[in-house]
């Protein structure tokens, strides 16, 4: 196992665990609060969980040296809107269970990557077809995703984030 892939997997697991811990501690009222983009906290937690498989699919394409084609921010926004409509009332238990399941699967996939695969680069349509590495995709999407939404959730429920050393 690569030290780099292990470090990435640990960071993903840490973010997912922090998100699950926060979600579990929220009151029913906090669970239903809208974040800045209008989605409820409950929907955001489920969204992060549901995106891990898609984000990993794209990262694994780059790991294999294959381009990511046809994925645009317009498409991402459409996926998010559809998800909001379908999971606007998802239960806390369901969202947290999916978060734990999908983050564990994503971490396992990351751990299986070699340094060579992490360094493979190919055009990524989501980023103007820039030739980006698998590691960049992992850091910018599945690893960062939970932290990004944690900040939004903490802001809406009035919690202050205290950065911790890695």
Language model features by range: what are they?
Residues 11, 79-120:
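Acidic/histidine-rich alpha-helical segments that form the ligand environment
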Residues 21-24, 28, 53-60, 104, ...:
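Charged/polar positions within long, soluble alpha-helices
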Residues 1-4, 36, 84-91, 130, ...:
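Short amphipathic alpha-helical segments at helix-loop
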Residues 2-28, 50-61, 140-147:
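Alpha-helical bundle segments that constitute or directly flank the non-heme di-iron/ferroxidase center
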Residues 4-6, 91-96, 138-139:
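Active-site rim elements
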Residues 5, 12-15, 37, 41, ...:
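Hydrophobic alpha-helical segments and helix-packing faces
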């Amino acid at each position: 196992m690569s030290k780099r892939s292990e470090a990435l997997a640990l960071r993903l697991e840490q973010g997912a665990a922090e998100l699950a811990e926060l979600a579990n501690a929220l009151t029913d009222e906090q669970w239903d609060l809208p974040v800045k983009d209008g989605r409820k906290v409950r929907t955001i937690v489920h969204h992060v969980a549901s995106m891990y498989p898609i984000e990993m699919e794209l990262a694994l394409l780059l790991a294999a040296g294959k381009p990511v084609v046809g994925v645009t921010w317009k498409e991402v926004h459409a996926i998010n809107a559809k998800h909001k409509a379908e999971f606007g009332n998802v239960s806390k238990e369901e969202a947290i269970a999916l978060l734990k399941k999908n983050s564990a699967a994503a971490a396992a996939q990351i751990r299986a990557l070699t340094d060579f695969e992490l360094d493979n680069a190919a055009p990524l349509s989501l980023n103007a077809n820039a030739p980006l590495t698998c590691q960049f995709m992992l850091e910018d999407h599945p690893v960062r995703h939970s932290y990004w939404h944690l900040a939004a959730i903490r802001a809406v429920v009035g919690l202050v984030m205290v950065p911790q050393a890695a």
